[in-house]
């Protein structure tokens, strides 16, 4: 314990009226001075209630002061006591035996005094220890009370939270019970909220219509028998095509027909090309003969040719014709068939290319239609799987809800059985064992004792035996305290409301004073601002007058400086 706290405790012991509101730490500075420390320690260790004057003694002393009689104090009192001692020594003459007896008595009294002083010091030490323990116990009690209040607050919060959760659970159960009403209720009061409650007839009819439309489409678009493949979802009808195996186009009859067709095309091409070549050669020969005839006619008309020259020319021309005929027959018999045959063979490439392009186009067309049908089938399958998955999820949720409700029913049944057992035990108590209001509570009834401790609170006075009547009294007192606290809370709330209303009025007055009914904040008084504006305008006018006067003075000085006559007059 600090010195300041000991000083305050000493003041409390001697009965100082305002010692309870003093703080011991505020008096620690008094013990810092060495001269005052010894006195203060003596004061804290020796002064008690016996050193304090009673009210009667104070009244007697005040009466003595009012009477005007002299009061001996200080040195005057010491001198009087000294004279009294000398007078006693002079007047009283004692024997040696009496002196010896008195000395023995003095020694015994001194010993008794010393023993009492030791006992007093021991008691003071015990008192200080007891006070220290009392303060420590008070601190522990305050801490325990604080912890108890915290625990009570925590338990209250847990209780409220549990109550809210139970209330929410009750509401959820009530909402859930609406969904499982009897089927005789109207549809308006029994809404369908689960997927299993909705009929699937419309959905199935739409899917059947979609399947029928898809089947009709496959009948129109694909070869015969494709719609049967679409209608039956047998896995044997859906197999991957192996590139290594021969296709339908590799049949021997089809290949033979194609070879014959290509041979016919080649023969037709050869015949056509020969006819074209013959026609072209005949046309060219006709044109050349006509041209030659025209030239010779012109020449015969313009020139006169001898018969001998004409015969020689005819013979030369006949020889040239023979040579040309030989060349033509050579080309016709040997060169032309080989060229035409080679050209006919080259005709296979565009024909085969066109055939393959036609097959590729057909294959692309069928592939696009197959992809369209496949996408529709995938969508239909996805919708079926989605509905199935939704039903499975809903079924799982129903199973989870069912298990939770089963566990809840089991717990409630267990609680119900326990409650019935408690009620049976309470109802089976005989009349002879029923507790009256004055019967003490059993020490084994911990719940009632705990209730009594909670109701009693910080009361230091502990009862040896607790009765139901006492418990009712404590509960009634607690009820009265609660009502008083509620009244105080209502009064404080009303005072707080009045304070807030007054504060709002003050704020409104301040806003009126600052804004003056406008939206702009006024940082100064409006009247003072107007006076400042007037003073500023007057100062501006005075400044203009001074500038005019100075300008006039400058002009006059300039005139005086230039005109000597004015200077003489001045």
Curated annotation (Swiss-Prot):
Organism's domain of life?
Eukaryota
GO biological process terms on file: cell division; centrosome cycle; spindle assembly
Coiled coil segments of this chain: 90-124, 154-178, 284-336, 458-495
Q: What is its main location?
A: cytoplasm
Q: What does this protein do?
A: Contributes to mitotic spindle assembly, maintenance of centrosome integrity and completion of cytokinesis as part of the HAUS augmin-like complex.
- According to its UniProt record, which protein family does this protein belong to? Belongs to the HAUS3 family.
Q: What is this protein called?
A: HAUS augmin-like complex subunit 3
